[in-house]
């Protein structure tokens, strides 16, 4: 953006002289188109400089990020190292491996989890994954009742072998809306028959469930979703709403696992009481 380019040099100079700064420390009037909504040129410039490696996040004050020059915190020899990926193909294999490792296992179909990998399209992704399977870097798996192959890192082979063994009663987990597992909603819907939308950015009247709703995983199934509200002053975790998924048979093991998970969640938040 032209407006971002106009402020880059001033931002560099100010951070060099004054140390870590946030977007609020710059008096630029202009706004730029930026992802979900227009943003101040200072914020867009700081985020851009962070993404290309010129700045680091030094600290936060609440939700506000303070940026500093990367060279003050990262040794120069790291900056001087050559890119290990000398070809586009090598870069794509490296980035595909990172994405699959981040999720655990994943398919090769187009979707949100593949966004942001420079130059990668469907044909290149397919070719890269096939080569990674041939070389032994990835393992191709078939899931009973699932129409598409999925892939995981070869380092997970032992874990896959152990997954056939009985491990006792299933456990419950609350999944954060931006958890890697939920990156690709189409994948989750196809694999688990679980449809999830993060409704934070929807108007209240347009929401099906709630503002901040967490999926509940029990064993290998998504069995519910709920809306937690944490009262920081009273240190109370309020379970505002709870929705069981259609067809779920609620058992004592399931309820006990969810109770334990809720206690753990409350402890993580610092809640002293749970209210339903």
Give the location of each predicted region:
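Long, low-complexity intrinsically disordered regions
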Residues: 1-173, 179-180, 187, 194-198, ...
């Amino acid at each position: 953006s032209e407006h971002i380019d106009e402020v880059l040099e001033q931002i560099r100079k100010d951070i060099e002289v004054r140390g870590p700064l946030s977007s609020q420390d710059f008096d630029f009037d202009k706004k730029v188109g930026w992802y979900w909504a227009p943003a101040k040129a200072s914020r867009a410039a700081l985020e851009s400089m962070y993404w290309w490696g010129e700045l680091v996040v030094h600290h936060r004050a609440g939700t506000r990020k303070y940026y500093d020059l990367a060279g003050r915190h990262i040794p120069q020899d790291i900056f001087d190292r050559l890119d290990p990926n000398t070809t586009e193909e090598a870069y794509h294999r490296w980035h595909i491996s990172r994405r699959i490792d981040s999720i655990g296992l994943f398919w090769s179909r187009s979707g949100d989890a593949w966004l942001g990998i420079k130059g990668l399209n469907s044909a290149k992704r397919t070719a890269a994954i096939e080569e990674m399977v041939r070389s032994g870097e990835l393992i191709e798996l078939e899931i009973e009742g699932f129409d598409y192959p999925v892939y995981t890192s070869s380092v997970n082979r032992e874990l896959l072998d152990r997954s056939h063994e009985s491990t006792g009663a299933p456990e419950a987990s609350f999944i954060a809306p931006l958890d890697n597992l939920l990156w690709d909603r189409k994948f989750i819907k196809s694999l688990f028959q679980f449809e999830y939308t993060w409704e934070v950015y929807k108007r209240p009247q347009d929401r099906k469930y709630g503002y901040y709703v967490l999926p509940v995983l029990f064993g290998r199934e998504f069995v519910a979703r709920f809306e937690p509200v944490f009262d920081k002053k009273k240190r109370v975790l309020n379970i505002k709403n709870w929705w069981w998924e259609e067809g779920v048979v609620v058992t004592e093991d399931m309820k006990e696992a969810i109770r334990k998970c809720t206690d753990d969640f409350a402890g993580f938040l610092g809640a002293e009481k749970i209210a339903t």
